[in-house]
From Swiss-Prot:
Record gene name: hisC
Alphabetic keyword roster: Amino-acid biosynthesis, Aminotransferase, Histidine biosynthesis, Pyridoxal phosphate, Transferase
Domain of life of the native organism: Bacteria
EC number: 2.6.1.9
Organism in which the protein naturally occurs: Ruminiclostridium cellulolyticum (strain ATCC 35319 / DSM 5812 / JCM 6584 / H10) (Clostridium cellulolyticum)
Cofactor(s) required for function per UniProt: pyridoxal 5'-phosphate
GO molecular function, one term: histidinol-phosphate transaminase activity
The protein, known as: Histidinol-phosphate aminotransferase
Modified residues (N6-(pyridoxal phosphate)lysine): 217
Length: 358
């Protein structure tokens, strides 16, 4: 009886299932390998000891955090909304803009929430396929052509793209913005710190541009579930219409605002991971039978014919990476998060041994 009550569009959904098995090295979720700076941990402890009054609801508008983000990005706090991870903001965008049957244009392969949020809101998800023969490159021409044909309410660009790691050049994104004026163009920059690129400076020029950012990747705060959007004031006010009240806990607001003051430490971590990414890329390319995709993020996508077998053997060693066996375009692919030099070296050694039967 319960199944009959579920909306027909939702019945086929499969709840997200992260690998919960014991592990030795975890390189499957694009998390940072770095914990918080010691001085920051001390300040967090002081915050708790001083009684943050957790018996009270948090600031429903996250004013201090938005102010800190505004100063960090040189924008006004009125350009910013904070969400429980960018996942919540993606769902809010769908709830605000989609009437039943309205369309969302999203890249494939990419982050699954773009499609799921659309379906949950009663919309129609229309994908544009990234060019598999050109390292999954974006095409502004393809996006614009599909926009003209489908007239979507929302267009998603993931930049760098997850899970392929490639970048859409800024001038190509601007072409899309200039042509697709009747859509909200969402540029998801969850991994942009690793590519040193952003379209945030263009929010004043393009009223329909919305950028998504997160504290989960470069800032190493996946555990507090905090993301944010930056857009024109008019677009920000629209998105804020269905944001749940008190959606960010007091602890999360304080922690996210605090880490913004540790720019040097965070930048050092980013630089470390970028250097490791390039080292791992180079080493992976030395292994016969692997197709290795260049990356502007904190992960690398590889393709190999016996990926399921390799994935299983890595898991047996306690090394977790992400497999995509259910994705037609990525059925032979695995995504490897960049960890510490020690973690990456262990992975490379095990991968080498598996591929060469040693």
């Amino acid at each position: 009886m319960i199944e009959e009550l579920i909306r027909s569009e939702i019945r086929s959904f499969i709840p997200y299932n992260a690998n919960q098995q014991p592990y030795k090295i975890k390189l499957d979720a694009n998390e940072s390998p770095f914990t918080l700076p010691p001085q920051m941990r001390k300040k967090l402890a002081e915050y708790i000891l001083e009684d943050p009054q957790l018996n009270l609801y948090p600031d429903t508008d996250s004013v201090q955090l938005r102010q800190a983000l505004g100063e960090y990005w040189s924008v006004d706090k009125e350009n910013i909304i904070v969400g429980t991870g960018s996942d919540q903001l993606i769902q809010i965008i769908a709830n605000v803009f989609l009437e039943k049957g309205d369309k969302v244009l999203y890249p494939t392969p990419s982050f699954g929430m773009y499609k799921d949020s659309c379906v949950i809101a009663g919309g129609r998800a229309v994908d544009y396929i990234l060019d598999q023969n050109d390292n999954f490159s974006y095409s502004a021409d393809k996006i614009i052509k599909t926009y003209e044909l489908e007239q979507p309410k929302v267009i998603y660009i993931c930049n760098p793209n997850n899970p392929t790691g490639n970048l859409m050049p800024q001038d190509e994104i601007l072409r899309v913005l200039k042509a697709c004026t009747k859509s909200v163009v969402v540029v998801d920059e969850a991994y942009a710190e690793f590519s040193d690129t952003t379209v945030i400076p263009f929010i004043k020029e393009y009223e329909n541009l919305l950028i998504l950012r997160t504290f989960s990747k470069a800032f190493g705060l996946a555990g507090i579930r905090c993301g944010y959007s930056i857009a024109s004031e008019k677009l920000t006010r629209a998105v804020n219409l269905t944001r749940p009240p008190y959606n960010i806990s007091s602890l999360s607001q304080f922690t996210a605002a605090l880490i913004l003051s540790y720019k040097e430490e965070i930048q050092n971590n980013i630089q470390y991971l970028v250097e490791e990414r390039e080292r791992v890329l180079s080493k992976l390319k030395e292994i016969d039978g692997l197709k290795v995709y260049s990356s502007a993020a904190n992960f690398i996508l590889i393709k190999v014919q016996n990926s399921k077998d390799i994935y299983r053997k890595l898991c047996e060693k306690g090394i977790f990476v992400r497999a995509f066996s259910s994705s037609p375009l990525l059925s032979d692919c695995m995504r490897i998060t960049i960890g510490t030099q020690e973690q990456n070296s262990i992975l490379l050694d095990e991968l080498y041994a598996i591929c060469y039967n040693k």
